[in-house]
Amino acid sequence: MIGVIGRYDGDIIKVPSNLIKIINYYGKTPIIIAPTKSYDEVFDKRKIDKILKNLVGIIIPGGTIWSSIDSYVVRYAIENDISMLCICLGCQLLSICDSQIVKDNLEKNCSAIEHNSKNKYAHSIFINEDSLLYKIIKKKEIEVNSRHNYHINNKFGRIDAYSSDGYIEALEIENKKFILGVQFHPEDLYDDINMRKIFDYFFESCE
């Protein structure tokens, strides 16, 4: 089973449909972990633990704001070495999961490159050769989409990739089966071989 954090939006819990399709494609069962509030929710950790201990992988999707459940799940995955893919907002959370810094302290977009674009491909990223992302894709430069409003300026974890304007585009937690954060949205570029490789590697690590 693969856990996916839902995004609270009033009376609706949203989950990207492309992620559900991809999880099903790889023969896994998606388990939605649904917050009931958008940020400072108080929740029963014992109930969440019962869900998390049965998961082989976790996906932290993009969104506009995370909940306290997000923070708990990210730390749980790191501490228990559960494979985890953190996308956009999830990547931003991964970058500060060793602190109590909130989203407002992340850096707003302020560069010449369009980091919040509706284009299929928004810009290039440059991948460090000694990184997990390079091990997966085996390329030093690829094109990605981009829809994030915040840059990463904290350096928790190993930096895997940058944009040409110097902002962090991917990071990993070392010495784990698979914990990778990306600022782009691979689920929306699944027809791109580079994005498929990310999911291939993630789901292989979940076996």
Region spans (language model):
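A glycine-rich beta-turn/hairpin centered on an aromatic-Pro dipeptide
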Residues: N145-N153
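Conserved hydrolase catalytic core segment
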Residues: I101-V102
